[in-house]
UniProtKB/Swiss-Prot annotation:
GO terms for molecular function: GMP reductase activity. The gene is guaC. NADP(+) binds at residues 205-228. This is GMP reductase. It is an enzyme of class 1 (oxidoreductase). Its EC number is 1.7.1.7. The keyword NADP applies. Keywords: NADP, Oxidoreductase. The keyword Oxidoreductase applies. Catalyzes the irreversible NADPH-dependent deamination of GMP to IMP. It functions in the conversion of nucleobase, nucleoside and nucleotide derivatives of G to A nucleotides, and in maintaining the intracellular balance of A and G nucleotides. The lineage of its organism: Bacteria, Bacillati, Bacillota, Bacilli, Lactobacillales.
Length: 327
């Protein structure tokens, strides 16, 4: 029964340290395997237009990080796959569920991407199940990520349809206002929703949304995530595609949600907003810091790799009064 599960979010949890068994944090292995491939970190920059573009995707792939290209420039996806493969890099793209996407997927048979993410706000839907089946029929070797969902029932249905991983999180992101506009979602209890969904999953879970600090990555892994999708922490870099804006001599980058009017181009069914983030240096610096912090997390967990994080104890401290958005 849902009402019987503990409800908490990232700021309500503290992980409990174990005896350290490594002599240097640099010995901690932060790598993760997804499908047939190994990546340096269990993090994914959100597949949003103000977070990732083709240049950043190439940079990430070359350096051994996982990425998911957004779906908002439909005509560029096929040339993008070709260009990545010509460089010996993996191709990871997004699709929606409109009728035209079925034809697009079929057209990829001659040069199939390694990863396809079905990317819609409410992923527990017949339209998503139908698209999973279509991709698996047309491109059986492609790894399919489906989402977004927020319940164990949704995870099981998408896995049963053929999804290789599911993305958990409805509305917890910094520029997502689904919870306010609709009354639905995992905002405010994203970590508990992740735990609930992961217990039902037989395949990898990707936690998506609500990450405000690097420590939240470790918490996500503790509660069942194989990988963590992050928006705001990856926004605002010099390389970020978001428009640069100057206010009182200080530079900012635009960051907006995929369901915002800025993305849609019209004020219809809006569930996202736009914010300005102070420009904060280079993406590579953030990735390095994330890795170092995660290595520290592994050392506190008393292990040598990410799996050690899954076995630590935790306490619920109920610091909900501390709003993660203020960090």
């Amino acid at each position: 029964m849902f009402n019987d599960i503990p409800v908490f979010d990232y700021e309500d949890i503290q992980l409990i340290p174990n005896k350290c068994i490594i002599t240097s944090r640099s010995q901690a292995d932060t790598s993760v395997t997804l499908g047939k491939y190994q990546f340096k970190l269990p993090v994914i920059p959100a597949n949003m237009q103000t977070i990732i573009d083709e240049t950043i995707a190439e940079q990430l792939a070359k350096e051994g990080y996982f990425y998911i290209m957004h779906r908002f420039d439909e005509d560029s996806r096929k040339p993008f796959i070709k260009r990545m493969h010509e460089q010996g890099l993996i191709a990871s793209i997004s699709v929606g569920v409109k009728a035209c996407e079925y034809e697009f997927v079929t057209s990829l048979k001659e040069d199939a991407p390694e990863f396809i993410t079905i990317d819609i706000a409410h992923g527990h839907a017949n339209s998503v199940i139908d698209m999973i089946k279509h991709i698996k029929t047309e491109l059986p070797e492609t790894f399919v990520i489906a989402g977004n969902v927020g319940t164990p029932e949704a995870v099981r249905e998408l896995e049963n349809a053929g999804a290789d991983a599911t993305k958990v999180g409805i509305g917890p992101g910094k520029v997502c206002i689904t919870k306010v506009k609709t009354g639905f979602g995992t905002g405010g209890w994203q970590l508990a929703a992740l735990r609930w969904c992961a217990k039902a999953a037989r395949k990898p879970i990707i936690a998506d949304g609500g990450i405000r600090t690097h420590g939240d990555i470790a918490k996500s892994i503790r509660f069942g995530a194989s990988m963590v999708m992050i928006g705001s922490l990856f926004a605002g870099h010099f390389e970020s595609p978001g428009k640069t804006v100057e206010v009182d001599g200080e530079t900012f980058k635009e960051y907006y949600g995929s369901a915002s009017e800025y993305q849609k181009g019209e004020h219809k069914n809006v569930e996202g907003k736009k914010i300005l983030l102070p420009t904060k240096g280079h993406l590579s610096d953030t990735l390095t810091e994330m890795q170092q912090d995660l290595q520290s997390s592994i050392s506190y967990a008393g292990g040598k790799d990410l799996d050690s994080l899954r076995h630590v104890d935790y306490v619920i401290v109920k610091n909900s009064i501390w709003n993660g958005d203020s960090i």
